[in-house]
């Protein structure tokens, strides 16, 4: 199995390999690997190779409770760490993430953190999934439609098919296109505007963090501690 992911990252957790084994051997994934090898020979690609599958290594398949869907990794130096909306330690939170923290503050009274590193959420079962897992430096959208969306759609479908009671947070029009992949009879879908400032504050007041925890608690599942510090 390691050979099938060589050139990208052989360190995706075994729990995911079991449910995604057909993806790693599919022709589109071979093409994606070749594309990434060519990209890396000419350009800087984010996140670093060892972080491409960070979302899966922090949130094992068996531990998924919540899924937050993003679009692309951040394309600035040092920002992307493989988790949607998250940035590496020491990096100033981008505007969308700042708005997420503002909503957390008004929803649950959680102080706005200094860090934008969301690994503590991922470690508790929040799958922070970008639809596209890589990007060329300073070139947003550059790795779209190269195969990643096929792979991450399969991830969403696998979670939907094999699990139940998962809370999917779909923020913005793009994330909401993924609703068709989710079995609404088995899972919970919460929708809101994107936290980007371009949405002119429409994200605020969604209370998705408290709503998520109420859903989890109602099922007898330990809620998420959304605090980062």
Which stretches of residues belong to each language-model region?
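Generic N-terminal amphipathic, Lys/Arg-enriched alpha-helix
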Residues: 8-20
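A polyanion-binding, active-site-adjacent surface
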Residues: 10, 22-170, 174-177, 182-191, ...
């Amino acid at each position: 199995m390691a050979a099938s992911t060589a050139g990208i990252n052989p360190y995706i957790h075994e729990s995911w390999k079991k449910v995604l084994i057909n993806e790693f051997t599919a022709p589109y994934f071979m093409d994606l690997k070749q594309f990434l090898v060519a990209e890396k020979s000419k350009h800087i690609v984010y996140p670093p190779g060892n972080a491409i599958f960070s979302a899966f290594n922090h949130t094992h398949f068996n531990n998924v409770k919540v899924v937050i869907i993003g679009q692309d990794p951040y394309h600035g130096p040092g920002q992307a760490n493989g988790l949607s909306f998250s940035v590496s330690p020491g990096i100033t939170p981008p505007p969308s993430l700042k708005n997420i923290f503002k909503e957390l503050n008004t929803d649950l009274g959680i102080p706005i953190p200094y860090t934008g590193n969301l690994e503590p959420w991922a470690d508790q079962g929040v799958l922070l999934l970008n639809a596209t897992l890589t990007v060329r430096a300073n070139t947003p959208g550059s790795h779209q439609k190269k195969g990643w969306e096929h792979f991450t759609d399969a991830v969403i479908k696998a979670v939907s098919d094999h699990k139940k009671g998962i809370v999917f947070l779909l923020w913005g029009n793009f994330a909401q296109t993924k609703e068709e992949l989710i079995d609404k009879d088995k899972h919970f879908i919460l929708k809101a505007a994107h936290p980007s400032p371009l949405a002119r504050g429409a994200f605020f007041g969604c209370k998705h963090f408290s709503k998520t925890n109420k859903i989890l608690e109602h099922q007898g599942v330990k809620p998420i501690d959304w605090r980062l510090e």
